Amino acid sequence: MSIHISAKKGDIADKILLPGDPLRAKFIAENFLEDAVCFNEVRNMFGYTGTYKGHRVSVMGTGMGMPSISIYARELIVDYGVKTLIRVGTAGAIDPEVHVRELVLAQAAATNSNIIRNDFPEFDFPQIADFGLLDKAYHIAREMGVTTHVGNVLSSDVFYTNMPERNMALGKLGVKAIEMEAAALYYLAAQHHVKALGIMTISDNLNDPTEDTTAEERQTTFTDMMKVGLETLIAND
């Protein structure tokens, strides 16, 4: 048992999906896993372990933002021995070529957060995905016929920014989307020598708000992302 997770040793698989929304974790467990057992309800941050196509996997919510995912991911890695972590979440498109319901695989994550600069104030430490996971996820998504973009994302500390033009300028530099967790997850993976990847479904298009999705759609309809994440988790077994 850790401070924020009530599971016992052995309750959590060594590979896990990490949606931000705990209700999305519940949805994944109920709709994709067999024999799913809930291992955590602390702070309503639901976590489950079950099997997917005969492979033992877990899924757990992380909440919103880098401080929150840093708490849960670190405890999963350090206290429970998780070796492979895939974030499955939503993002807002800033690249004009990226649209709602398409996937973005975060090859790297820029950030405006100080969560990494607290450790390395004198330079920018690049946050990158595990290439093996990235490669597998890309080919799995392509085989499924899912429109998928690979590239940089911005992990932001701010959802409601007062300077949206600064974020939009990044789209002109090839940054695909804005989200709030990947950079912290990648930094933890680098520290602890484990594998991590961010798979995002575009829920909002900052270039065209008419494409935006509802809260219910974000919770229950982004199943392509969930399938790609699960298939990627078991691809090494």
From Swiss-Prot:
**Protein's UniProt keywords contain Transferase:** yes
An example Gene Ontology CC term for this record: cytosol
- According to the record, the segments passing through the membrane are none
Which keywords appear in this protein's UniProt record, sorted alphabetically? Glycosyltransferase, Transferase
Give the annotated active site.
D204 (proton donor)
A GO molecular function annotation here is:
purine-nucleoside phosphorylase activity
Q: Where is this site: Important for catalytic activity?
A: R218
Q: Which reaction does it catalyse?
A: a purine D-ribonucleoside + phosphate = a purine nucleobase + alpha-D-ribose 1-phosphate; a purine 2'-deoxy-D-ribonucleoside + phosphate = a purine nucleobase + 2-deoxy-alpha-D-ribose 1-phosphate
Which leading EC class covers this enzyme? Answer: transferase
Source superkingdom = Bacteria
Sites where the protein binds phosphate: G20, R24, R43, R87, V88, G89, T90
Instruction: Identify one Pfam family in the record.
Output: PNP_UDP_1
Q: Can you tell me which residues bind a purine D-ribonucleoside? A: H4, E179, M180, E181, S203, D204
EC numbers listed for it are 2.4.2.1
A GO BP annotation:
purine nucleoside catabolic process
User: Which InterPro entries does this UniProt record tie to the protein?
Assistant: DeoD-type, Nucleoside_phosphorylase_CS, Nucleoside_phosphorylase_d, Nucleoside_phosphorylase_sf
Sequence similarity:
Belongs to the PNP/UDP phosphorylase family.
SUBUNIT field: Homohexamer; trimer of homodimers.
Which purpose does this protein serve, as stated in its record?
Catalyzes the reversible phosphorolytic breakdown of the N-glycosidic bond in the beta-(deoxy)ribonucleoside molecules, with the formation of the corresponding free purine bases and pentose-1-phosphate.
UniProt protein name: Purine nucleoside phosphorylase DeoD-type
Please give the organism. Answer: Streptococcus pyogenes serotype M12 (strain MGAS2096)
